[in-house]
């Protein structure tokens, strides 16, 4: 699968632009703020129905305009190509179409054109709270299992209802134990399904991660990745039962898979967040995302798109070259990369003997360099 063509109308800082891509590696080069990352975000829209950076769709309409449209032509086989479009008018619902037909639900599109994106913002997976790491797990599983996304939505809805019930009980000083048991039963059923899928996913995912990190670092340091969940140590039903008084006092659900986390460590168990250098943290993140790529490829049977935004920052030349050698291998599919230095990216690919198509980006316009 690869993206053959991308067209933008009134999207972010682009008025109108159409680009024809290589099925191998494509680079967007130019100064910061020119619009390189906006092109990656447009591709992300076509894959996942939303921006990678900003969930408010209306803020992606070009200043002074009333709407935007992003269109792409995906080629899955030599004989099969799909036209995907996303459009939005101010104060109206977002429209998402495949071959000019609307999707009944946006969730039906997720996973059809899988994508992995690596950006400087991803450092939040390491430095921020557990919610960011759960989002990472859920994003990966959702692109390979549509039912997982539905189950996750259902779980979040029940948690919200249970928390509202606990708040009402605190206000009235009356607790309906029968209704609480219904919420608990629903939560246990759905939560156990999510826990089982997350646990199975991590067992498959971890070997991919280790392989990629060892390659990038050339076995320079030992890192570990562990899945943490309250359900690893007790049943969900028992956790809810034993924490009932605590939940009443807090007026929220204190235990469950919404407390799951990933533990990242380096140097035999030291927290990566505190003891990893910026280069080691970036190598860890890239290995995570490349493991996501390998997981998608195994599950889907074809290569997803790989988007690399400003990945050279904070990496030494050796690790940079190893990453580019890896992703430009025939085992990988189509790649999009941004860099402020056209000569640098051109030289890297010349050194490893791989073709690359370079687009010069200036003030919301992108043109192929000949």
Spans of features found by a protein language model:
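Conserved NTPase motor "head" modules and their coupling/switch loops across ABC/AAA+ ATPases, GTPases
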Residues: 1-31, 174-305, 314, 318, ...
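Post-Walker A helix-loop "phosphate-sensing" segment adjacent to the P-loop in P-loop NTPases
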Residues: 45-57, 291-299
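Nucleotide-state sensing region of NTPase/ATPase domains
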Residues: 48-126, 130-132, 141-144, 148, ...
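Structural recognition of the conserved hydrophobic beta-strand(s) that form the central parallel beta-sheet
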Residues: 72, 334-341
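Walker B catalytic acidic pair
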Residues: 309-311
């Amino acid at each position: 699968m690869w993206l053959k063509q991308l067209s933008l109308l009134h999207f972010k800082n682009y008025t109108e632009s159409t680009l024809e891509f290589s099925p191998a590696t494509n680079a967007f080069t130019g100064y910061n703020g020119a619009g390189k990352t906006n092109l990656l975000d447009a591709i992300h829209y076509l894959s996942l129905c939303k921006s990678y950076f900003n969930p408010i769709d209306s803020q992606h309409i070009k200043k002074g305009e009333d709407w935007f449209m992003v269109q792409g032509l995906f080629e899955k086989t030599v004989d099969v190509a799909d036209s995907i479009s996303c459009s939005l008018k101010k104060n109206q619902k977002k429209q998402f179409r495949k071959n000019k037909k609307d999707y009944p639900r946006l969730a039906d599109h997720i996973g059809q054109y899988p994508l992995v994106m690596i950006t400087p913002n991803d450092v939040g997976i390491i430095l921020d709270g557990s919610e960011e790491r759960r989002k990472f797990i859920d994003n990966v599983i959702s692109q390979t299992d549509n039912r997982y996304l539905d189950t996750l939505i259902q779980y979040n809805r029940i948690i919200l209802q249970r928390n509202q019930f606990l708040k009402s009980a605190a206000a009235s000083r009356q607790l309906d134990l029968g209704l609480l048991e219904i919420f608990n039963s629903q939560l246990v059923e759905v939560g156990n399904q999510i826990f089982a899928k997350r646990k199975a996913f991590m067992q498959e995912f971890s070997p991919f991660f280790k392989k990629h990190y060892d390659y990038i670092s050339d076995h320079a340091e030992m890192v570990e990745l562990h899945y943490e969940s309250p359900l690893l140590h007790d049943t969900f039903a028992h956790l809810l039962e034993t924490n009932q008084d605590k939940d009443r006092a807090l007026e929220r659900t204190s235990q469950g898979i919404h407390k799951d986390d990933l533990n990242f460590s380096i140097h035999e168990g030291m927290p990566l967040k505190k003891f990893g250098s910026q280069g080691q943290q970036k190598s860890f993140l890239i290995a995570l995302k490349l493991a996501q790529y390998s997981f998608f490829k195994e599950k889907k049977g074809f290569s997803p798109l790989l988007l690399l935004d400003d990945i050279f920052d904070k990496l030494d030349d050796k690790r940079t070259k190893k990453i580019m050698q890896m992703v430009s291998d025939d085992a990988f599919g189509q790649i999009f990369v941004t860099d402020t230095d056209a000569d640098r990216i051109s030289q890297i690919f010349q050194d490893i003997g791989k073709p690359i198509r370079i687009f010069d980006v200036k003030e919301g316009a992108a043109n192929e360099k000949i």
